[in-house]
Amino acid sequence: MIARPARDVLSSATKKQFRFRGCLAARHEPYHTSTSRAGQVAILPATTDDKTLVSVFDSPRSNAKLSAFATTGLFNHSTVTHPRALNSIAQGTLIRAHVLTNRILRAKESREELFKVVKNLDRLSDMLCSVIDLCELVRNSHPDRAWVEAANDAYEGLCQTMNELNTHVGLYDVLKIVLSDPEIVKSLSPEAYRTAMIFWNDFEKSAINLPAKEREEFVALSSEIISLGRMFLEETTAARPPAKIPPSDLAGLKDKGMGVRLQLQAQFTQRDLHVYPGSLQAQMIMRSAPAEEARRRVYIASHSSTPEQIELLERMLSTRARLARLVGRESFAAMALDDKMAKNPTNVARFLDSLMDRSRPYARRALRNLSMRKQEHLHTPPFPTIQAWDRDYYCPPEPPAPPIPLPRLTFGTVLMGLSRLFRHLYGIHLRPVKPIAGEVWHSDVHKLEVVDEERGVIGLIYADVFARRGKASGAAHYTVRCSRRTDDDDVQGDNDELTRMYPDLIKQSEEFEAVGRGPIPGLPGTYQQPLVVLLCEFARPSLGAAVLEWHEVMTLFHEMGHAMHSMIGRTEYQNVSGTRCPTDFVELPSILMEHFLNSRQVLSLFHADSTSSSSQPIGNHDEDPCHSIDTYAQIMLAALDQIYHSPAALQPGFDSTRKLARLHDEKGLIPYVPGTSFQTQFGHLFGYGATYYSYLFDRAIASRVWKDVFSSSPLSRETGERYKQEVLRYGGGKDPWEMVSALLKAPELASGDAEAMATVGRWKIEDEVGLPGRH
């Protein structure tokens, strides 16, 4: 059965997906913002906790070392003090999972137990997930190879059990009994019923109701897809042969640094210059070579593939299609979209067609402007065709910049701004605390308590933000522990002879699971406290505080959007907590956070002493004239993803390159370049097969939410509270269409049908063309 990955980031294409993984503070009176004289918005002053973020995170730590005398283990698990502990905990967890599985299988013998099946399935999922997610984090961040290897071993063993549970006929049969019983179904809360249906749908996707031979084929095909996908991902970054550039084509390079050096090299050797795709030289030539032929050669070299690379991709696509046909679906897209907001490929097509129709005029206008630049440069007849290799030369990509002048933003300053923003919106702030010796895996790692003004500490964030050898690249939000209600677990009912045979292993597993539990003021029962890790690769400062580039500030806001979703989405079932929601909904909170950086009022929060700010909106300070071209290119990629995962993948003679060329011929604005095959570098085809539209989709919704809900008063507690109550608090425990419909007061969206998808497509261009351009 399939579950939401713990790492929520679009680039996490290599991550497996699982379903069966699967302290109180003083109470404060709620804060309220107010508007003072016209044009000014009153801002809550920075608190001591806010200012402490700056001093703690901006203090030099380059020489800091972890204590050799640990008093606790990772994430305050007292038993996780040594790599071997991961193996012991994994073994104990597997035993307990086996016992709980047997209990669920026996539930058909007891009506009382049938009422507990959904809860126990979620417990089983969480029991395994909690260890898998910890191991996943260790695999990607720990500097000690012994820890990484131990995490890998534990991870693989637990995943094997997951795969067995994914196709467990007995569990499926018990759940079928539960969902066929009107009395039991009526007793389930909406959140519990949604959890049950998630398990049911994932079982159905796993060929659970097919004969044994077909189930074996399903497992074999699934394993083959994973293997092909890994090989495909390796090839997406494989070196391509160099472009050979004659010295004469390097004349007039606009770059006076590297360009001059290349010209001198070519003059000295009198040989063709070999330029490797992806290199700094290749990027420089695409941006600054007046000679079109030089750019054409680099472009073709950068988008070339070997026959073997193309064949590998097409094997992966056809194997996915065979898997879908095995379970009775027309295509892999139909199978993948069944539990998404989009529901089916037809609805995705409506969204993308609507998006294309609205985006095309703006992209054409931008291309016409580039054509005029090309005409002036080459002295051609009017409006020469813009080719794929012209884009960066006539409109060089620029790094994103803040919409208004700002002082240098240190990491601590940005965290202070985020804390102040969360206080305005949700009555929540960030409080730095010193980790106990042994609690973190590197001296760079900081610990933050997430503090609610009424409920005290509601979660923990560990921030590991500086690049280092062996650490995963990119930025990501890892969910290490999910919210879940635990006081009604009925652990006593798990008693089994097996647990008495391995008391030490069972004890370790139970102690591991018990960490982070406690009451929540205002709610009945006991809950697991969510714990997330923020991994980034910001440049480590050689001296003083880390100063962030604007794109890094945007990244931090994005990832903290995921973190707040995890903190506020305190559900009773871990399978729907926080970011455990559909792929085409999970990016909404994180993308929405980026929009706040377009507000003067929010930007003023980076100044510790600010108490007021102009409420005047920021205009199009630096609108990128080519932004619409890039947006259209993203829509084309999403359309290509749908084509590749359609029934066409099983047609005789399926040719992925021909499909790419045909898409460009029918809907593209820049001509396809014969001989190129970019699709072999489109890594998201593996990790986000048939769902690449999701990022565009959530961008569209976030744009509308910002425009209609937040833009006029981005620091309003009333508005923030409405967003928290209508969206964030549910995690994945409610239909996303119902959440969006309620938030936007648009009841026509609630059904989430094809027309709703088309409506969202129309939002995209209406909002985005007015936003400052970002590359």
From Swiss-Prot:
Keywords: Hydrolase, Metal-binding, Metalloprotease, Mitochondrion, Protease, Transit peptide, Zinc. Its cofactor is Zn(2+). GO terms for molecular function: metal ion binding; metalloendopeptidase activity. InterPro entries: M3A_MIP, MetalloPept_cat_dom_sf, Neurolysin/TOP_dom2, Pept_M3A_M3B, Pept_M3A_M3B_dom. Zn(2+) binds at residues 558, 562, 565. The keyword Mitochondrion applies. Residues 1-28 form a transit peptide. GO terms for biological process: peptide metabolic process; protein processing involved in protein targeting to mitochondrion. The keyword Cytoplasm does not apply. It comes from the Eukaryota. Binds 1 zinc ion. CDD domains: M3A_MIP. Gene3D superfamilies: Collagenase (Catalytic Domain), Neurolysin, domain 3. Pfam families: Peptidase_M3. The gene is OCT1. Cleaves proteins, imported into the mitochondrion, to their mature size. While most mitochondrial precursor proteins are processed to the mature form in one step by mitochondrial processing peptidase (MPP), the sequential cleavage by MIP of an octapeptide after initial processing by MPP is a required step for a subgroup of nuclear-encoded precursor proteins destined for the matrix or the inner membrane. Belongs to the peptidase M3 family. The lineage of its organism: Eukaryota, Fungi, Dikarya, Basidiomycota, Agaricomycotina. This is Mitochondrial intermediate peptidase. The active site is at 559. It catalyses: Release of an N-terminal octapeptide as second stage of processing of some proteins imported into the mitochondrion.
